């Protein structure tokens, strides 16, 4: 296994913190940075010296993704989830949070290291219960959390001082850095001139109620605008569309299909094989659009996705960044060297995807949360701050401009970087 330079830095920093007496660091690294690669490497290293490792995830897609990566690394492991035969002899176990919380009293051994994937979820009672029980059998238990964003909708911090699990923060690598190093492509945002009015949409648990949101977003005018935008800015480019709920996703897929653009809606009711077929269809060109509500927010690695259509307003910065991340993965031209930044850039430009991902923002998320590649400061307190000079407190939202000619959304500048329009 060969780690990238920055991934080696993650591993070294985590080891340094454990050696210094920290027991529960949280690694924050952008979608596409290879967090699964890093924690699989750490798990393998721990198992090699006789430690028992538990990897926790909350979705079957994430569990299977971790299992595949461990298999790639030659790590014998068990999967603790409904439908899998227990492999108790394995030192590494990948587990569903929902399954293991029910089997805590039946575990035949203690663990030395717990890895928590999507660790921004770990403030939930189920995670805290699991860790407390595992610490009863091993007071020296170490924890490693990994996440792309430690900010939660409920405002809870993830630090132990705030009732969370973690005692230190490892700031990994940002989307901006990954783009600059040619490990991700650049998002190019376009949005309609008019933003949707959400003032009457009720919120539940800190975010918009999906049913009420669908009533606002699931309208022919909005869907038609998204279809027109895809045809104008990125015709033929494989895309995923994030929708308010499953019914909305089905309606959007039907509208794209009716417009002569092959589309399919995916939901949690679809089995894994159906998801894989749809994603493969996107890569082959048989399908142009996959619509979804929450299914593809996490755990999807399909580099062919070249456009992300945002049709779901959200208060969740974490979900927003994850969805944009679905389209930022690179496709390097086969056979070209990719050892240096310059080589990777050349291989991206020569590849079938190119150097950008189109973000068609019909949900106003860029105006709400800023650009996906903005540099953010993270905290275990749950507070997120944008780096850079302070803005006028009267100024609301990020420093975003929208070109009146091509509707490109970009950081404020005197000239539109897309069409060259000069702002007055």
Kindly label every feature range from the protein language model.
Residues 64, 78-89, 250-257, 261-297:
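Conserved helicase ATPase core of P-loop NTP-dependent helicases/translocases
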Residues 120-189:
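Post-DEXD/H (motif II) to motif III coupling segment of the RecA-like Helicase ATP-binding lobe
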Residues 167-243:
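Conserved interdomain linker/interface between the two RecA-like ATPase lobes of SF2 helicase motors
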Residues 82-113, 124-129:
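Conserved helix/coil segment N-terminal to the catalytic DExD/H
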Residues 36-38, 45-72, 246-247:
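Conserved Walker A/P-loop ATP-binding site and its immediately adjacent core
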Residues 1-28:
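Conserved pre-motif I regulatory segment
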Residues 96-101, 113, 268-376, 380-381:
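Conserved RecA-like P-loop NTPase helicase motor core
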